[in-house]
């Protein structure tokens, strides 16, 4: 069987060679395919036995194939030679290519199936590479067929040196278009400013067309070029307002709709409204009538006729109901029960004191037929320090009339309270007031005026009563309440001991300073009047006739005319009869100099001792200064308020100069201060106050609260006293704050 199988394969190979020779164009491809097909057909066509002698059969086949192999080689050689002869006889073209078949055809060798499969894979790979146009690596073929078939294919190789990647070419920069908007705000302002104003006017006005016409006419008037017609139609400016002639026509049309009346009817209406006196010739002369009406409307209300009869007055009083009015101050100070008990004492005291000292004993005005001779009139005045201008009827002394008719009257509706007529000529009831407050008191019983030596704001703890800070306007001038109630609560300490500094809170309520010195100043800035007499006079508004009758010694200054009335009062013909005068209340106490005249020797001794002490003081002062350390000297400079110095000699000279100047200015304060310096910061404050009082123009600026530059103030003080250059700037600021001087930093 093995022999038969080998012969069959041999025939198959011979037939395949014959086919390959006939088809020379596809020699390489088809011969290989036929050979592969022949090899592949070996495995499925072989019929192996399934007996247990498979291994022995395999070994026998190997031996037989080994014996027959030389025979097959010889037969293949003979067959190939025969085929060559046949090809030469059949195909004459093959003579030009004698070596084509012999050189390219390899010997067909029977090989193993596994090796054949690998060969097939290699052939498929080469065929696939031949079909490719580009490939990464070139392959080397050992077969002649491959070299011949790949001769026309040129392998492309990558150069060894790679070219640098070309950079992206930047586009050439083009010029910026001027039409492009850079800033939208500038663009809107330059292009739409007029339209914006027009739109704003539209929003604020009622008629849009009217505003547009006004803007258009303004633009036409301002521009030299002829204005462009809107929408190229040549529209002209039109207005919605009426011309003068149009207004006249409208007025005529309006008057025609009203009912017509004759002049007699109008005169009757005029007479009914304004009386017979003002209705005459009212239509003939309209200007005169209007002028009379205007003047009549501006005149003050007419005073009641003094010649009225008592019966007529009683009838008016009965017909009109009394209007009871009461002010807030009267409600708070109403003491009607006390007044009823002591009315007689008050009236008698008022009659005795009003005319002698205070110049307020005015002659009662006696109306004709209204007041009986036995009536009592009490002049009630108020003590004021401020320059008060009031209404004529308010300044007119209120009279308390007790007439016989009132006393004998049994009518329950009418009481004994005084009746005072107001500006509307109505009878009104005046509620009783505290007569102790408004009637002048004797000199001995008058309470002393409260004066403020420092003029600074005082601070109190919450434990104080609010009534302590109320100022009586009849006893003092109107000022801000200096007593402030702190909103802070007092902490209850277990020990029960609280420091006064912890309960005081500085709250600035006025222009007065917020820094309170440890010791009250001996001198403060005051006007010339305050220096001469503090609280010794009052300024009141009185009749000129009554002031002339006063004692000339009581009137301190000349009379002041009333040049301006209050904003709520009306001008009357009685304004010229009043004046404002400063009347002295208490004679200033004269300082007696009897002791100094009686004992001249003692005064001379004092002068001698002071001179001796002043002569010996510089040496003693230098000894004290030299014994002190540098730290103590600097602390003394800081305490006193002088500028710091570098060396010890400069500090001693500064303190010595200050002590000499302040000792000459205040000789009474020698020896009061212990320590290094024999003076304090308060004495420096007093010395600065004395220096600034020598400049009236500066005082005027201080009193008017004008902010003064600090440099200017220091230069002014330095011109009066060179020692000011050694005073620290913070000390001057503190002194200015205590005195109420407004300062500002002058930055040059």
From Swiss-Prot:
The lineage of its organism: Eukaryota, Fungi, Dikarya, Ascomycota, Saccharomycotina. Regulatory subunit that interacts with and increases the activity of different structure-specific endonucleases. Has several distinct roles in protecting genome stability by resolving diverse forms of deleterious DNA structures. Component of the SLX1-SLX4 structure-specific endonuclease that resolves DNA secondary structures generated during DNA repair and recombination. Has endonuclease activity towards branched DNA substrates, introducing single-strand cuts in duplex DNA close to junctions with ss-DNA. Has a preference for simple Y, 5'-flap and replication fork-like structures. Residues 76-88, 222-236 have a biased composition (Basic and acidic residues). The modification Phosphothreonine is found at residues 72, 113, 319. Residues 62-75, 277-298, 591-602 have a biased composition (Polar residues). The keyword Heme does not apply. It is found in: Nucleus; Cytoplasm. GO terms for molecular function: 5'-flap endonuclease activity. It comes from Saccharomyces cerevisiae (strain ATCC 204508 / S288c) (Baker's yeast). The modification Phosphoserine is found at residues 289, 329, 355. Keywords: Cytoplasm, DNA damage, DNA recombination, DNA repair, Nucleus, Phosphoprotein. Pfam families: Slx4 (PF09494). CDD domains: SLX4_RIM2 (cd22869). Present with 274 molecules/cell in log phase SD medium. Phosphorylated by ATR (MEC1) and ATM (TEL1) upon DNA damage. This appears to be required for the function with the RAD1-RAD10 endonuclease. Residues 62-104, 215-236, 277-303, 591-610 are annotated as: Disordered. Belongs to the SLX4 family. It comes from the Eukaryota. This is Structure-specific endonuclease subunit SLX4. GO terms for biological process: DNA damage response; DNA replication; DNA-templated DNA replication; double-strand break repair via break-induced replication; double-strand break repair via single-strand annealing, removal of nonhomologous ends; interstrand cross-link repair; regulation of DNA damage checkpoint; regulation of DNA double-strand break processing. Forms a heterodimer with SLX1. Interacts with RAD1; catalytic subunit of the RAD1-RAD10 endonuclease. Interacts with RTT107.
């Amino acid at each position: 069987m093995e022999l038969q199988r080998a012969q069959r394969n041999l025939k198959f190979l011979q037939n395949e060679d014959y086919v390959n020779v006939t088809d020379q164009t596809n020699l390489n491809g088809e011969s290989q395919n036929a050979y592969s097909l022949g090899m592949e057909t070996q495995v499925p066509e072989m019929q192996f036995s399934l007996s247990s002698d498979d291994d022995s059969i395999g070994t026998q086949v190997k031996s037989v194939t080994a014996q027959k192999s030389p025979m097959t080689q010889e037969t293949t050689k003979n067959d190939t030679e025969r085929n060559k002869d046949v090809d030469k006889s059949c195909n004459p073209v093959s003579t030009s290519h004698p070596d084509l078949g012999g050189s390219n055809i390899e010997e067909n060798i029977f090989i193993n199936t596994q090796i054949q499969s690998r060969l097939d894979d290699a052939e498929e790979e080469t065929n696939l590479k031949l079909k490719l146009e580009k490939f990464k690596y070139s392959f080397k073929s050992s077969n002649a067929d491959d070299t011949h078939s790949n001769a026309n294919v040129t392998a492309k190789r990558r150069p060894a040196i790679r070219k640098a990647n070309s950079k992206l070419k930047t586009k050439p920069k083009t010029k910026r278009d001027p039409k492009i908007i850079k800033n939208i705000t500038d663009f809107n302002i330059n292009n739409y400013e007029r339209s914006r104003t027009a739109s704003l006017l539209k929003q604020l006005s009622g008629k849009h067309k009217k505003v547009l016409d006004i803007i258009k006419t303004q633009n036409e008037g301002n521009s030299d070029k002829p204005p462009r017609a809107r929408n190229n139609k040549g529209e002209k400016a039109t207005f919605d307002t009426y011309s003068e002639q149009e207004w006249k026509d409208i007025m005529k049309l309006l008057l025609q709709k009203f009912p017509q009346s004759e002049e007699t009817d109008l005169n009757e209406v005029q007479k009914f409204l304004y009386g017979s006196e003002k209705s005459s010739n009212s239509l003939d002369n309209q200007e005169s009538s209007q002028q009379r009406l205007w003047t009549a409307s501006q005149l003050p209300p007419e005073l009641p006729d003094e010649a009225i009869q008592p019966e007529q007055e009683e009838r008016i009083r009965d017909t009109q109901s009394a209007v009871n009015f009461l002010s807030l101050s009267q409600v708070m100070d109403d003491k009607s029960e006390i007044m009823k008990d002591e009315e007689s004492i008050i009236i008698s005291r008022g009659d005795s004191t009003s005319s002698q000292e205070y110049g307020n004993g005015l002659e009662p005005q006696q109306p004709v037929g209204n007041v009986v001779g036995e009536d009592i009139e009490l002049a009630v005045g108020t003590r004021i320090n401020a320059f008060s201008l009031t209404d004529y009827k308010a300044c007119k002394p209120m009279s308390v009339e007790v007439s016989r008719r009132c006393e004998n009257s049994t009518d329950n509706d009418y009481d004994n309270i005084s009746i005072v007529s107001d500006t509307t000529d109505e009878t009104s009831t005046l509620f009783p007031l505290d007569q102790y407050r408004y009637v002048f008191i004797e000199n001995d019983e008058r309470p002393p005026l409260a004066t403020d030596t420092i003029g600074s704001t005082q601070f109190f703890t919450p434990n104080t009563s609010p009534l302590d800070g109320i100022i009586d306007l009849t006893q003092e001038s109107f000022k801000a309440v200096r007593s402030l109630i702190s909103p802070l609560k007092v902490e209850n300490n277990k020990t029960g001991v609280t420091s006064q500094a912890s309960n005081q809170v500085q709250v600035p309520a006025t222009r007065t300073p917020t820094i309170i010195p440890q010791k009250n100043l001996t001198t403060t800035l005051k006007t010339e009047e305050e220096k001469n007499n503090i609280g010794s006079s009052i300024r009141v508004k009185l009749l000129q006739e009554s002031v002339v009758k006063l004692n000339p010694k009581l009137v301190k200054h000349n009379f002041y005319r009333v040049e301006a009335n209050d904003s709520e009062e009306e001008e009357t013909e009685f304004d010229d009869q009043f004046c404002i005068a400063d009347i002295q209340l208490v004679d200033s106490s004269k300082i007696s100099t009897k002791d100094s005249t009686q004992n001249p020797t003692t005064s001379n001794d004092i002068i001698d001792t002071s001179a001796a002490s002043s002569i010996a003081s510089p040496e003693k002062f230098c000894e004290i200064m030299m014994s002190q350390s540098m730290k103590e000297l600097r602390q003394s400079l800081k305490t006193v308020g002088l500028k710091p110095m570098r060396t010890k000699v400069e500090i001693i000279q500064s303190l010595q100069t200050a002590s000499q100047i302040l000792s000459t200015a205040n000789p009474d304060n020698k020896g009061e201060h212990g320590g290094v310096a024999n003076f304090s910061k308060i004495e420096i404050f007093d010395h600065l106050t004395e220096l600034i009082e020598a400049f009236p123009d500066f005082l005027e600026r201080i009193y008017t609260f004008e902010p003064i530059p600090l440099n200017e103030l220091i230069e002014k003080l330095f011109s009066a006293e060179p020692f000011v250059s050694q005073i620290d700037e913070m000390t001057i600021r503190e002194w200015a704050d205590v005195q109420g001087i407004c300062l500002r930093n002058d930055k040059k």
